[in-house]
A protein has these predicted regions:
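Short, charged, amphipathic alpha-helical segments
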Residues: 110-113, 176-185, 377-385
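Acidic, low-complexity, intrinsically disordered peripheral segments
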Residues: 22-24, 395-420
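Bacterial N-terminal signal peptides
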Residues: 8-17
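Periplasmic alpha-helical coiled-coil/stalk elements that build and connect Gram-negative outer-membrane
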Residues: 126-241, 337-344, 387
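Amphipathic alpha-helical coiled-coil segments
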Residues: 47-59, 126, 130-151, 167, ...
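Small/polar, glycine/serine/threonine/aspartate-rich low-complexity segments that form flexible
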Residues: 22-28, 71-104, 108-110, 221-232, ...
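A glycine-/polar-enriched beta->alpha junction
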Residues: 36-46, 53-68, 82-85, 93-110, ...
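Bacterial Sec-pathway N-terminal export signals of envelope proteins
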Residues: 14, 21-69, 98-99, 107, ...
Length: 420
């Protein structure tokens, strides 16, 4: 009796956690609706999009010429700055303009355009990663809620059985030991349900952050019980698709291209820029009212930008290695995702059609058979545990198959298999 009373106390403590979802606002949501909200409201994506806009603004900035420089000097000893009407007057004005040589301005514009392309690819890669997390969270929530329903169904059956056994115990038809074992089974199941509820809360938190939703809302994913996967691509086609579509591969290639453009720019910097100017000198030159044309350029004797050119050449070698590393990584990721999907597809095909429907009916019959004392308590408990294990494994297998398809989509950078 003390154990029975302890179990009842613990169950009463856990029940508020088990029923927590009922006190919150529940929203049924499809994967398509979740992705639409994600694309519109996710702040990480919005912030990354600003980087694209910033890079585009810097392209425009790179196109501008340097401002001209105005030089002048006047006398200040008597405060009469422009006494040019008298024999002592003096005015000196010089206007200069720097002219970029060796195509420096165009090369700088090209580097800025590379940065725009890089920012766009970073945005695409972030979206790819976040969408993968979103779809995995959706699949995880779907699995958790379906497992929750199995627990709730089993708990309801055991609670009904427990009430009947209490009456049978009072009538002396069953032993205290059998009654306690059923209550212990119920308690263990309720404990598992409470633990599952905490896992649901963690997944809901991450899902809500991705959707940027406020309030105490519980999202309930809407997905068909069975997931049909049809893969029509060969492994070679999948590898080519990943090479052409993955934004992180494109980003590595853009970095290599940008480093090549930077080398061209650094070589151009070794060519001196030309400064041209026009000047007027009223009285201090060899003649009054002197007009002159000025040209100046630094002599490339001490600094010919060799260090930066060498660094740019090394950056190209580094970028080449990074492209090769990225291509090898992508290849292995696609191969692993492909093999995983094939393995889970084969496992799914071994499950008989309508297996769980028959098992559910058998569970109801088993509960009734135990109430009618047609099976022993040990047989009932063994069957009950086996049913829970089989039902949850079936759900996990379906979720794993869906996740494997999502992983293949993720590793190839495009939707190879559409999952709703």
């Amino acid at each position: 009796m003390p154990f029975c009373r302890l179990a009842q106390v613990l169950i009463s403590v856990l029940l508020p956690f088990i029923s927590v979802a009922q006190s919150q606002d529940s929203v049924r949501i499809s994967l398509a609706d979740a992705e639409q909200v994600f694309m519109q409201k996710n702040l990480s994506l919005l912030a990354q999009q600003y980087n694209v806009d910033i890079s585009k603004a810097l392209v425009q900035q790179a196109k501008y010429w340097d401002n001209p420089t105005l030089n002048t000097d006047q006398n200040i000893y008597d405060g009469k700055f422009f006494r040019h009407n008298s024999e002592f007057g003096q005015v000196y004005v010089q206007l200069q303009q720097v002219i970029k040589t060796a195509g420096k301005r165009n090369k700088l514009v090209q580097l800025a355009q590379d940065d725009v392309l890089s920012a766009q690819q970073q945005f695409s890669d972030m979206m790819r990663n976040l969408r993968f997390i979103l779809r995995n969270d959706f699949s995880t929530l779907n699995l958790q809620f379906k497992t929750w329903r199995i627990y709730q169904s089993e708990i309801a059956s055991l609670e009904k059985l427990s009430v009947g056994m209490d009456a049978q115990l009072q009538a002396g038809n069953i032993s205290q030991k059998d009654n306690i074992r059923v209550k212990a089974l119920l308690y263990n199941l309720q404990t598992d349900a409470a633990s599952l509820q905490q896992s649901i809360a963690d997944t809901e938190k991450e899902f809500a952050i991705l959707l940027q939703t406020g309030g105490d809302t519980v999202f309930i994913p809407q997905r068909e019980d069975s997931v049909n996967i049809h893969l029509s691509y060969s492994l070679g086609a999948l590898l080519d698709t990943a090479k052409n579509n993955r934004p992180d591969v494109q980003l590595a290639q853009t970095n290599l291209l940008s480093q090549q453009h930077n080398l061209s720019y650094q070589k151009a910097l070794a060519t001196p820029d030309l400064t041209v100017g026009v000047e007027y000198d009223q009285r201090s030159s060899y003649i009054n009212n002197f007009w002159g044309l000025g040209l100046s350029l630094p002599l490339p004797i001490l600094n010919r930008n060799k260090g930066n050119i060498k660094a740019a050449e090394t950056n190209i070698k580094q970028a080449n290695v990074q492209v090769q590393q990225m291509q090898n990584t992508v290849q292995q990721e696609v191969i692993a995702a492909y093999r995983k999907l094939l393995s889970l597809q084969h496992l799914q095909q071994t499950v008989p059609q309508g297996f769980m429907e028959k098992y559910n009916l058998l569970l109801k019959n088993m509960v009734q058979s135990y109430q009618d004392r047609q099976v022993s308590l040990l047989e009932f408990i063994d069957f009950f545990d086996a049913y829970k294990e089989a039902a949850t494994r079936q759900l996990q297998q379906q979720a794993s198959l869906a996740n494997a398809a999502e992983e293949l989509n993720y590793t190839t950078g495009t939707t190879i298999i559409s999952i709703k």
